[in-house]
């Protein structure tokens, strides 16, 4: 009987706290929407470890507010005890991608050395930073690189992506273009380019809006290019977590 009573009380308390949390979130959403009509659509409101401070997630961005939505704070929270960037850690979690779920069959694949480590790159054939990154990746050993072509920069990017993808040895053609500037031969005849469309859909799903964008085995994603030493560091770290 006592056990049943304790269980009932615990459930009642849990329901009370849940209702209070929902009411607080609703108040914050309401006040921000009414007071800031141009405020972006809110995806989540979560209580933080700091009393009275709430996290507001807008897509992959984080801002903070008080319990009434009276103030909005932009910036990163640093835990001075651990020197941990709490905000960045949260963003890393939000933006993480399940590496195992990526459709690698739609990627151009090349490797160096054993290829035991893996890296995904979203790239546009006209992306200057992608070319620099591809060139510098020659310094990184024992890695397999999966490149998803996403022609998002306009101009002749779609044509170049098609020419590369349809080449018999698209990995060699891709690297020759990115590193040496040797244009891919024009694609002639029938070629299934639906993979390129799927890549664009996937990029939109994961909110990849610029190139290059990197994804490591542990799901960590990095917008933009990294120098070889930092790529190496991230590859080692991702193998430890994957």
Language-model segments: residues:
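Extracytoplasmic thiol/disulfide redox context detector
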Residues: 2-7, 16-162, 176-179, 187-210, ...
């Amino acid at each position: 009987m006592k056990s049943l009573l304790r269980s009932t009380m615990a459930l009642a308390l849990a329901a009370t706290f849940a209702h209070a949390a929902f009411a607080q979130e609703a108040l914050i959403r309401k006040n921000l929407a009414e007071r800031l009509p141009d405020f972006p659509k809110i995806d989540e409101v979560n209580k933080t470890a700091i009393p009275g401070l709430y996290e507001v997630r807008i897509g992959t961005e984080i801002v903070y507010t008080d319990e009434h939505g009276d103030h909005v704070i932009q910036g990163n929270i640093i835990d001075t005890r651990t020197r941990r960037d709490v905000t960045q850690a949260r963003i890393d979690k939000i933006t993480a991608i399940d590496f195992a779920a990526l459709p690698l069959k739609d990627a151009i694949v090349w490797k160096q050395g054993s290829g035991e480590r893996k890296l995904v790159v979203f790239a546009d054939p006209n992306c200057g930073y992608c070319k620099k990154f591809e060139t510098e990746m020659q310094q990184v050993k024992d890695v397999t690189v999966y490149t998803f072509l996403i022609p998002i920069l306009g101009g002749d990017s779609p044509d170049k992506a098609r020419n590369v993808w349809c080449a018999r040895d698209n990995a060699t053609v891709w690297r020759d273009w990115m590193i040496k500037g040797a244009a891919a031969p024009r694609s002639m005849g029938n070629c299934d380019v639906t993979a390129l469309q799927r890549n664009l859909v996937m990029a939109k799903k994961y909110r990849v809006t610029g190139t290059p964008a990197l994804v490591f085995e542990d799901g960590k994603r990095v917008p933009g290019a990294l120098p070889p030493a930092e790529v190496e560091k991230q590859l080692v770290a991702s193998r430890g977590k994957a």
